[in-house]
Amino acid sequence: MKITFLGHAAVLVEGKKNLIIDPFITGNPACPVKLEDLPKIDYILVTHGHGDHLGDAVEIAKKNDAIVISNYEICQYLGKKGVKTHAMHIGGSYLFDFGRVKMTPAVHGSGILDGENIIYGGNPGGFLITLEGKKIYHAGDTGLTKDMELLKEENVDVAFLPIGGNFVMDVEDAIRAVSMISPRKVVPMHYGTWEIIFADVELFKKKVEEMGVECVILEPGESLEL
């Protein structure tokens, strides 16, 4: 299984089925690819309704006849745009043809900006994805929460955690999150896209590895194999 970081919080998972999480491609200053560069996508996972996460979900879904997995409200919004969806909510899990997805809590917002209006986008979340014998945790946008302690029991293989501060956890809180989750690997995300979310990623790596957890800093476009 190949996992590619596409910048900000966008992650491409290529295996027996191809998944993309938070597909912010167009307009993402950190993303090294264009929509036409993506492989065929089978499923799109959207953690919440903000534009830098909902991103190109509609265009990718229609081009690939892909299914969007998100919360109920976002799925209702996308369904009206002709997109195939599978609605979930926090704490719910479902076995798909590629593996199991569980929606986890996140502390953030989820409003969808539509012209001059903000549409209610339900509750933000993260995803615990079990596929091909591995577990991937994508936290979405979130502050530090004690709920993360429950993930320690899941034996997460790789955790994608936001570290950029201001809107999400900063480096210090993300380090605390790692101690709660105890993943085998952690990949920092949601930092450096814009100046307001600058983070000292090398400090994060140093502190995480002092805890005995491997920290993999992926530049946009780089991949790891699971």
Swiss-Prot record:
Key words of the record: Hydrolase
Keyword field contains Repeat: no
InterPro entries from the UniProt entry: Metallo-B-lactamas (IPR001279), RibonucZ/Hydroxyglut_hydro (IPR036866), UPF0173 (IPR022877), UPF0173_UPF0282_UlaG_hydrolase (IPR050114)
Molecular function GO labels: hydrolase activity
Sequence similarity: Belongs to the UPF0173 family.
Organism of this sequence: Thermotoga neapolitana (strain ATCC 49049 / DSM 4359 / NBRC 107923 / NS-E)
Tree of life domain: Bacteria
Protein name, per record: UPF0173 metal-dependent hydrolase CTN_1413
